[in-house]
């Protein structure tokens, strides 16, 4: 393989690595946002549950 061909392969590998890394970061941001939304919903549900006596006894709200 010539020097020019090796440099081209190197650039393609760097580009592919960058694309994979960028899309992985974007996907993890989406998962984090979904997890944060779920945590918020669970917190609100628990706060509402603590105002109901039968639910309060079941889940031991403090």
Swiss-Prot record:
Post-translational modification Pyrrolidone carboxylic acid, affected residues: 47
Molecular functions (GO terms): acetylcholine receptor inhibitor activity; ion channel regulator activity; toxin activity
Known tissue expression: Expressed by the venom duct.
Ligase as UniProt keyword: no
Pro-piece positions: 22-46
Keyword Signal: yes
Cystine connections: 49-55, 50-61
Major site of localization recorded for this protein: secreted
Subcellular location: Secreted
Family of the protein in this entry: Belongs to the conotoxin A superfamily.
UniProt domain comment: The cysteine framework is I (CC-C-C). Alpha4/5 pattern.
Function of the molecule: Alpha-conotoxins act on postsynaptic membranes, they bind to the nicotinic acetylcholine receptors (nAChR) and thus inhibit them.
Name the record gives this protein: Alpha-conotoxin-like Ca1.1
Species for this entry: Conus caracteristicus (Characteristic cone)
């Amino acid at each position: 393989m010539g020097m020019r061909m090796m440099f081209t392969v190197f650039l393609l590998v760097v580009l592919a690595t960058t694309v994979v890394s960028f899309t992985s970061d974007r996907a993890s941001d989406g998962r984090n946002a979904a997890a944060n939304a779920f945590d918020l919903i669970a917190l609100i549900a628990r706060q509402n549950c603590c105002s109901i006596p039968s639910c309060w006894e079941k889940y031991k709200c403090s």
